[in-house]
Swiss-Prot record:
It comes from Ruegeria pomeroyi (strain ATCC 700808 / DSM 15171 / DSS-3). It is an enzyme of class 6 (ligase). This is Argininosuccinate synthase. It is found in: Cytoplasm. It catalyses: L-citrulline + L-aspartate + ATP = 2-(N(omega)-L-arginino)succinate + AMP + diphosphate + H(+). Signal peptide: none annotated. It comes from the Bacteria. The keyword ATP-binding applies. L-aspartate binds at T122, N126, D127. SUPFAM superfamilies: Adenine nucleotide alpha hydrolases-like (SSF52402), Argininosuccinate synthetase, C-terminal domain (SSF69864). Its EC number is 6.3.4.5. The lineage of its organism: Bacteria, Pseudomonadati, Pseudomonadota, Alphaproteobacteria, Rhodobacterales. Pathway: Amino-acid biosynthesis; L-arginine biosynthesis; L-arginine from L-ornithine and carbamoyl phosphate: step 2/3. One of its GO terms (cellular component) is cytoplasm.
Amino acid sequence: MSAPKKVVLAYSGGLDTSIILKWLQTEYGCEVVTFTADLGQGEELEPARKKAELLGIKPENIHIEDVREEFVRDFVFPMFRANAVYEGLYLLGTSIARPLISKRLVEIAAEHGADAVAHGATGKGNDQVRFELSAYALNPEIRVIAPWRLWDLTSRTRLLEFAEAHQIPISKDKRGEAPFSVDANLLHTSSEGKVLEDPGVEAPDYVAQRIVAVEDAPDTPEFIEVTFEKGDAVAINGEAMSPATILTRLNELGGKHGIGLLDFVENRFVGMKSRGVYETPGGTILLEAHRGIEQITLDSGAGHLKDSIMPRYAELIYNGFWFSPEREMLQALIDKSQEHVTGTVRLKLYKGSARTVARWSDHSLYSEAHVTFEEDAGAYDQQDAKGFIQLNALRLKLLATRNRRVAGK
């Protein structure tokens, strides 16, 4: 295959992608366009511009974009309407960011007439799959370059040696070592590598970057109210906010109260198990609040069906199939279920816990008259339960009769 002439690189300014930038230049002699997404990772992105310029990228070929609102509105919120959780615990913070990055890579490639895009995901992880499935779904003709599957820089040590040889600056943490492998956005921060690769060793306290230790969280609980319209959060404590602002505020509250820290060994799509430490403070609160408002507004049949498809929906996102027809079909079903998921939830934030303590809605299906232990003024005739039970017991009785008859032979 011929060398690409122009490549759009998903560029963070970190170690891997800075090395990839230089490698693309030296390996192919091609022009490189960089794309850096502000997904709310909480760091200054202008250094990425300066580093790209230092590595020879033309100013007009450097794209740094604030996509926080689009990220939360079009990716995070639709996912949270489903209460999506992978393997019972993981809130998909890394997974859900990849489709948006891939979308912009493909769009920028078209704008610049580039014949390829490139990413910094390793050949062992899920992100390579997510980036590439999304890119091919949006442009089946695009060429994707994955240096980790092509070069011989197969360890952190060799990467550092390459960086030093090409005078690429590398950030160091306070222990004098290259940082953990970290992925951050407005929804979460993940940490992998180093001591975390041994699942039998407790993660050091310094791994957590967004969330205070539970022991250091305030000794007094804090109560907040989250308001929803059709399944999406629209206000906190009565104040209307944009999607990204809501998640930012919930992150602040959750981090302050030690909420949303997860030490998790997951099953990667590529077949291996991996261990990571995930911090999802705002997302943890949002999930609890959304479940709380659904409890009184969602019909039981619709809710149980929605719960049954959630694992499949979450798996599709985890595995990189955001732009697949099956994900879109499930999304349509989920969104239909949210038509009346409107109301307000009060939560108690305290020492690592976000707990729903009250919920109310003009769309509520909750009828106190039907469930009260007191006089219900004829709202419910308890005698109706007899026929209901008899009909549901009929098949069980027939089964038991058959089994006795067969056993007696």
